[in-house]
């Protein structure tokens, strides 16, 4: 090898040079893979948001300082549910450096990110117009989504959503102070430990100072009582998509009364409605029949007589409904783990319900592209 060839030869190892490029000539859209799941989801979201333009316009004054566009607010909140972002502060941090997040929300690479407090203030405006529910309906009414929904077979269920309040905040309504506690070092403190043993606490006499809408409730015998709200879902049985979501006070009859309200609003005469053993009561079965629906609830015949008999259970459709009904646990599981609703981050039933409905819509948006791809 001659000396000239040796000097001109370049080493295989690349150099770890850090150089800042002032300008970038690649659009954000080119950074996102063509088969990324968020591409289909964004198309669905944009189509649904376009139908809400008039509803958005009613929430804002004609004159004034421009605020965060409501479309971008909702897209950002959907990302918070999709990727389990714990707080709005963390969401703004991710929007600052995550190009995928910027692309989905509609920000360019150079657009400034909003302050977390400003974001929350603008978000709360959407609560006044019940935008979360309107957005869910808009998604379900999209032509490509409507064809996926069953109009005759449904399932209902409820779950507890733990409130953002500790048991120490559950104090007597009459203002009497609870017995003083002691801290770890034996002295009292602002957040001193409490011994609740032997103390009778009921919703009639006590309420939470942190979230007065929360109720002390346990889902079943032997379960832990906690401050919570009760969330309700109605699912269509063809593809397991959520068609209604509501949040109410946690009590022993809320599941059945709310289910009847959802049936009346969404199910036509001749429909079937599946439910677990908690719905096998005379009042719920009678309520379904009054609305022209057949109750396909699981029989609860332990030390009691079931509210339905062989006239219902002998049909093949009953067995199918009891199998399909179990799928309603899937959205509840996703909403609590991925969607972050195992313990809500918000206070007040109105705001908690708003996020409950939006998270249910986020679950639908995760499922719809997969169903569309499977059905062709």
What are these regions (language model features)?
Residues 11-22, 26, 38-148, 163:
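Basic, low-complexity intrinsically disordered segments
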Residues 175-180, 185-196, 277-350:
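Helix-centered, glycine/charged polyanion-binding patches within enzymatic domains
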């Amino acid at each position: 090898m001659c000396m000239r060839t040796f000097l001109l030869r370049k080493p295989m190892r690349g150099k770890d040079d850090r150089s800042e490029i002032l300008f970038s000539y690649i659009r954000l859209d080119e950074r996102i893979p063509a088969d990324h799941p968020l591409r289909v989801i964004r198309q669905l979201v944009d189509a649904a948001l376009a139908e809400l333009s008039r509803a958005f316009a009613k929430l804002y004054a004609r004159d004034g300082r421009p605020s965060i566009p409501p479309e971008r607010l909702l897209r950002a909140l959907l990302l918070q549910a999709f990727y389990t972002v714990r707080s709005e502060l963390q969401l703004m941090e991710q929007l600052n450096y995550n190009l995928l997040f910027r692309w989905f929300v509609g920000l360019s690479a150079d657009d400034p990110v909003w302050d977390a407090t400003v974001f929350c203030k603008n978000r709360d405006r959407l609560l006044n117009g019940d935008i979360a529910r309107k957005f869910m309906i808009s998604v379900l009414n999209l032509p490509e989504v409507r064809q996926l929904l069953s109009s005759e077979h449904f399932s209902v269920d409820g779950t507890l959503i733990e409130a953002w309040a500790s048991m120490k905040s559950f104090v007597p309504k009459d203002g009497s102070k609870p017995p003083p506690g002691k801290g770890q070092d034996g002295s009292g403190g602002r957040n001193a430990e409490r011994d609740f043993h032997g103390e009778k606490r009921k919703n009639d006499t006590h309420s939470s100072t942190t979230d007065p809408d929360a109720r002390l409730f346990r889902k079943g015998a032997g379960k832990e009582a906690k401050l919570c709200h009760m969330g309700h879902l109605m699912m269509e049985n063809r593809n397991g998509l959520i068609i209604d979501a509501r949040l109410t006070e946690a009590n022993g009859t809320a599941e059945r009364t709310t289910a009847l309200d959802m049936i009346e609003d969404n199910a036509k005469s001749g429909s079937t409605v599946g439910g677990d053993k908690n719905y096998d009561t005379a009042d719920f079965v009678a309520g379904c029949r009054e609305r022209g629906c057949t109750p396909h609830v699981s029989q609860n015949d332990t030390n009691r007589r079931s509210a339905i008999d062989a006239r219902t259970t002998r049909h093949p459709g009953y067995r199918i409904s009891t199998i399909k009904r179990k799928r309603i646990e899937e959205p509840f599981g996703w909403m609590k783990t991925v969607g972050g609703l195992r313990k809500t981050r918000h206070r007040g039933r109105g705001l908690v319900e708003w996020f409950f409905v939006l998270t249910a819509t986020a679950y639908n948006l995760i499922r719809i592209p997969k169903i569309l791809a499977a059905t062709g």
